[in-house]
Regions:
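Accessory "access/gating" subregions that flank catalytic or transport cores
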Residues: 34-48
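Beta-strand segments within the central parallel beta-sheet cores of soluble alpha/beta enzyme folds
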Residues: 27-35, 56-64, 92-101
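Short secondary-structure boundary/capping segments
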Residues: 3-7, 48-51, 111-114
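Flexible glycine/proline-rich, aromatic-decorated loop/lid segments
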Residues: 44-66
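Conserved beta-strand-centric core segments of catalytic alpha/beta enzyme folds
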Residues: 41-42, 69-120
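Active-site pocket-shaping loop/turn-to-helix segments
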Residues: 1-18, 69-79, 83
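Phosphate/pyrophosphate-binding loops at sites that engage ATP/ADP/AMP, CoA/4′-phosphopantetheine
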Residues: 15-29, 53
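Active-site catalytic microenvironments for nucleophilic, acid-base chemistry
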Residues: 22, 49, 87
Length: 120
């Protein structure tokens, strides 16, 4: 694997921006986040790429993060998706974002969730 800077993952930012675009939302529209947190660098990486402050009042996790909840691999993210789904159902029109890292910050998936269907 070759990257110009191992501390950054432009593909993660591209995935997040594209998911937001497809959902018709912006980062400011997101009411709840859960960012995959195997290690602090994974969280700081996506925060840096998106311009999201680590102390954002919306918090960066709903579950407490991988070290405290879940298991290895993206199984943790299934718990995050379930929690985001509960949150957006309780607040129709709101958006939630789940970011999931795989590999060595070389694969990143993003889901933007809402209880309200997208209007195309």
């Amino acid at each position: 694997m070759e990257r110009q800077d191992l501390a950054h993952s432009p593909a993660a930012a591209m995935a997040a921006r594209r998911a937001l675009e497809l959902a018709g939302a912006s980062l400011a529209d997101i009411g709840a986040f859960d960012l995959y947190s195997c290690f602090p660098i994974a969280v700081f990486n996506i925060c840096d790429e998106l311009g999201l402050a680590p102390d954002d009042p919306r918090r960066l996790t709903l579950t407490g993060g991988l070290p405290f909840f879940g298991g290895a691999g993206n199984n943790y993210s299934m718990h995050a998706i379930a929690e985001i789904a509960a949150r957006v159902r309780a607040d129709p029109g709101s958006f939630g974002l789940v970011g999931a890292n795989g590999g060595i910050m070389s694969k990143y998936s993003v889901g933007v969730y809402s209880a309200t269907p997208c209007i195309e």
